[in-house]
């Protein structure tokens, strides 16, 4: 049928605007007919018609969305012709529609069921024409929504014939809605409309993980397991589409607490988590910055941190982006409530404010709070419950594999520019740097670089760089080993100076008793290393004064090659109060728990306890603390060897401390003349003739002297003229009560 010229007009009523039909007079067309409207030779639009008597004959009325879509103006001359749908090819099978609130003032966060919306849509617009790109108004639950047709697929022809579906669907530009057409609603971009139900499209969500993110390039090494655990707990639920999370009834994790020794990568990990996520830039706050001298300002600072997340959640609901807030040194503001002195209670109210913001009455589901501390024991326990900082991750000292990764990261640029010598073996350095933290490994690389650079500085009155040699600058294995020896010592490692003074004269194996002590000590070391059933092994070396107990304990510790060795000695606690002693001992043991393998030597226990026989008197507070520490098993995966020494076994027996040790080893004095002669021969201070003279006096006789006292007597007698040395030595033995004999 040839087209006829008509004039565009305004839709006569609001009710007719909601029908999505063009309105004509019944003298021109009949209701239910479909027409093509041509505004130009290349622009044609399909409409379904309704009749209304108020429309002037020769006019065709359009709603505002229809006029916008077709680019029509009131009074415009257009060509209108009847159109007939081919129902075999143009019945709509599936139609995707973008939806949003029509007016800003009607925006709310109520959920809208897309299944009910789809049924209402089919009922309202059955047997109507729809085109891709068409705009219309849709009324549902007394709300007006703006719709935009995004995509149309024709119905499978087999279904129309009453046959099983073949799955063949063709995209079409214009189609007719029928009773079994399916409608899928898609939320408009940046819309806060909350759609639920199955009749909605899967949203094209931006991946929460930055596609350019790479673990090694980010400069994190040795934290693979920790990071995978954090990802599983905190981010796995955020990677899935919201509809799946909603169906599971799953709530996102809102908080992570990273704790561990200083320099192990807590701050670095938190910073890189922010970079890893496709979220807005994280807010990084140092704990003490929150505090303010004015009343209420500290709490206001907490509220400001969460303000953006609250505003966005109100506006976008479940589709709000992720807001990350990082608290460094969180223990500064989240101490146990009631633990602070003073009447202001500022710290308590700050904790209360933070608790209510993370998981209070008005819950935020678009935040991730990351707290960092090396004192998790100080933090209020309410902050650590599920729903708040529920993921607690220890960032401990890296193992050998982790140290290898960290050293690779810090030497990568040198390797790339051929500044790292071929003799540098990163694996060797990883083995040698036991108990080094990430920061200490970085410091080791810096120290080696400075050692290498120093070789190329001219030694003259001026500081000048030898540019000729600087061109061939190389950081060598020797630079790393020199830095390891002289510059960088691990905070949680073994300081050789601690125990070197105890064995500066070596171990004198004057007889089987000494060998037996060392052999038993080696067995206990192997038990600590290899046994999974006894992660805590403790041994008490007891014996008379000056028998060399401390030296043997230090030797066993040294031979163990454990990465962490500390000596808890009373000479480091002179003048300490009982409480200070307990805290010092606790710190040594706490540090030991952070290492995979640790050895703690508790020297001269009776002195630690302030024991004196007159009274008698001792410190019960220190005794109880020591008993607890001796029996406390290390954390999972850590192993601890404790070596104690005492000269008063009887006193420890009365205090019931002997039972706290796994085993007791007796360290005797030199008891026979033969043992004394063996010690003298090993020491080599006397000549053969002098030793023969001494042997005549002591051989086959009983003596009683500690090896430490023997060394003192030998050194004293050596100060005499050679002809009087032996006589002086024998006299000193008699005076010390080492022998009942009268020596000539």
UniProtKB/Swiss-Prot annotation:
Connected disease: Developmental and epileptic encephalopathy 96: A form of epileptic encephalopathy, a heterogeneous group of early-onset epilepsies characterized by refractory seizures, neurodevelopmental impairment, and poor prognosis. Development is normal prior to seizure onset, after which cognitive and motor delays become apparent. DEE96 is an autosomal dominant form characterized by onset of seizures in the first days or weeks of life. Affected infants also have hypotonia with respiratory insufficiency that may result in premature death.
Protein name (Swiss-Prot/TrEMBL): Vesicle-fusing ATPase
PTM annotation (Phosphotyrosine): residues: 259
GO BP: any one term: exocytosis
Cofactor stoichiometry and binding remark: Binds 1 Mg(2+) ion per subunit.
Listed GO MF terms: ATP binding; ATP hydrolysis activity; ATP-dependent protein disaggregase activity; ionotropic glutamate receptor binding; metal ion binding; PDZ domain binding; protein kinase binding; protein-containing complex binding
Assembly and binders: Homohexamer. Interacts with GABARAP and GABARAPL2. Interacts with GRIA2. Interacts with PLK2, leading to disrupt the interaction with GRIA2. Interacts with MUSK; may regulate MUSK endocytosis and activity. Interacts with CDK16.
Pfam families: AAA, AAA_lid_3, CDC48_2, CDC48_N, NSF_ATPase_lid
Domain of life of the native organism: Eukaryota
Residue numbers of Phosphoserine PTMs: 207, 569
Modified residues (N6-acetyllysine): 105
Species: Homo sapiens
């Amino acid at each position: 049928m040839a087209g006829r010229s008509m004039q565009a007009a305004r839709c006569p009523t609001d009710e007719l605007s909601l029908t999505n039909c063009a309105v004509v007079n019944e003298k021109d067309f009949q209701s239910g007919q479909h027409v093509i409207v041509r505004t130009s030779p290349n622009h044609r639009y399909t409409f379904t018609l309704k009749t209304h008597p108020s429309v002037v004959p020769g006019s065709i009325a359009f709603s505002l969305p229809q006029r916008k879509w077709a680019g029509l103006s009131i009074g415009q001359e257009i060509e209108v012709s009847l159109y007939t749908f081919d129902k075999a090819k143009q019945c709509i099978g599936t139609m995707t529609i973008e939806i949003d609130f029509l007016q800003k003032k009607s925006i709310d966060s109520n959920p809208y069921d897309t299944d009910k919306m789809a049924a209402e849509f089919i009922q309202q617009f059955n047997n109507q024409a729809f085109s891709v790109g068409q705009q219309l108004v849709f009324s549902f639950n007394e709300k007006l929504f703006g719709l935009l047709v995004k995509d149309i697929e024709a119905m499978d022809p087999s279904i129309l014939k009453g046959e099983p579906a073949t799955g063949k669907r063709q995209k079409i530009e214009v189609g007719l809605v029928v009773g079994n057409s399916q409608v899928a609603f898609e939320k408009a971009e940046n819309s806060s409309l909350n759609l639920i139900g199955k009749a909605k499209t899967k949203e094209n969500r931006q991946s929460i993980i930055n596609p350019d993110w790479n673990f090694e390039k980010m400069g994190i090494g040795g934290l693979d397991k920790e990071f995978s655990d954090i990802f599983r707990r905190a981010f796995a639920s955020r990677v899935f589409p919201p509809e799946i999370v909603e169906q599971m009834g799953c709530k996102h994790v809102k908080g992570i607490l990273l704790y561990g020794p200083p320099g192990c990568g807590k701050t670095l990990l938190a910073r890189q988590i922010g970079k890893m996520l496709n979220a807005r830039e994280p807010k990084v706050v140092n704990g003490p910055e929150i505090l303010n001298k004015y009343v209420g300002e500290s709490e206001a600072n907490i509220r400001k941190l969460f303000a953006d997340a609250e505003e966005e959640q109100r506006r976008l609901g479940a589709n709000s982006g992720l807001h990350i807030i990082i608290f460094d040194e969180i223990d500064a503001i989240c101490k146990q409530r009631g633990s602070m002195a003073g009447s202001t209670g500022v710290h308590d109210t700050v904790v209360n404010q933070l608790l209510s913001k993370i998981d209070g009455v008005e819950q935020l589901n678009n935040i991730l709070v990351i707290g960092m501390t090396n004192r998790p024991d100080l933090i209020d326990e309410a902050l650590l419950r599920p729903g708040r900082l529920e993921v607690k991750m220890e960032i401990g000292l890296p193992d050998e594999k982790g140290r290898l990764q960290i050293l690779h990261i810090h030497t990568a640029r040198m390797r790339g520019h051929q500044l790292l010598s071929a003799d540098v073996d990163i694996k060797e350095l990883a083995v040698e740097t036991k108990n080094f933290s990430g920061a200490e490994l970085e410091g080791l690389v810096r120290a080696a670089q400075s050692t290498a650079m120093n070789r190329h500085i001219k030694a003259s009155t001026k500081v000048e760089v030898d540019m000729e040699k600087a061109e061939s600058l190389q950081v060598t294995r020797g630079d790393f080993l020199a830095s390891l020896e002289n510059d960088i010592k691990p905070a949680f490692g073994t300081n050789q100076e601690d125990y070197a003074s105890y064995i500066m004269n070596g171990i004198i194996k004057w007889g089987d008793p000494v060998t037996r002590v060392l052999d038993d000590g080696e067995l206990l070391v192997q038990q600590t290393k290899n046994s999974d059933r006894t992660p805590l092994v403790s041994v008490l070396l007891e014996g008379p004064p000056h028998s060399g107990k401390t030296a043997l304990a230090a030797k066993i510790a040294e031979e163990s090659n454990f990465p962490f060795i500390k000596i808890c000695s009373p000479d480091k606690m002179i003048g300490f109060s009982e409480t200070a002693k307990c805290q010092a001992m606790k710190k040594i043991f706490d540090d030991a728990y952070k290492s995979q393998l640790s050895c703690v030597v508790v020297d001269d226990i009776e002195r630690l306890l302030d024991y004196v026989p007159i009274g008698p008197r001792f410190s019960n507070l220190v005794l109880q603390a020591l008993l607890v520490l001796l029996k406390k098993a290390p954390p999972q995966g850590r192993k601890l060897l404790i070596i104690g020494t005492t000269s008063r076994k009887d006193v420890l027996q009365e205090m019931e401390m002997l039972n706290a040790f796994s085993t007791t080893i007796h360290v005797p004095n030199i008891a026979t003349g033969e043992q004394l002669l063996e010690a003298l021969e090993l020491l080599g201070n006397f000549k053969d003739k002098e030793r023969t003279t001494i042997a005549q006096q002591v051989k086959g006789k009983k003596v009683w002297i500690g090896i430490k006292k023997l060394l003192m007597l030998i050194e004293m007698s050596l100060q005499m003229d050679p002809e009087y040395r032996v006589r002086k030595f024998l006299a000193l033995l008699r005076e010390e009560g080492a022998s009942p004999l009268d020596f000539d």
